[in-house]
């Protein structure tokens, strides 16, 4: 039958291929609803599918700025028998409730708050390498990024020093700039969320080791930031 594939902006091609490929292999047709922030990749995929000989109507794409309205159409249409969604927990809950009305199958890959844990007996260099990879991939905008780093007391200061040295050495620039390590956030809302998390943490006692402000590279750039003294009362301890 028909599969509705609702995909996020942070990996606009990979998420489509992961959802569409198994659906096609199972003999289903697909309606892709890409993020309103990155619709062009989805349209390009559909165009390439047509060029490759995919029959008309097998892969379809619906774009638009009113994501809730499009979601309601997909979840209420009885011809759609499965919904697959990658995105926020809040939206996932809404789609789950809506899909229940017609008892659709549903697959949800939702947000989280992943910890990166460093114990006293850890290999310091390996721990720093791992933290850099886990935290700053795609400017930290992935669902599997380390949202918080928990470091045992005995290695804490050494880790902070080594990690901060690596963070401050990163080049913040447009991804097309040679040697760029960290690019922009997806939009103004994304930048504002980072600012709010940092401000909330500082107001509740956290300390800035480096960063903590927007970056001169542009309005959507935020300086790579290291905070210490973070506790569970702060928003960044529980929000993605």
Describe the function of each predicted region:
Residues 82, 90-235:
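ALDH superfamily catalytic-core signature
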Residues 1-126:
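Rossmann-like NAD(P) dinucleotide-binding subdomain of oxidoreductase/dehydrogenase enzymes
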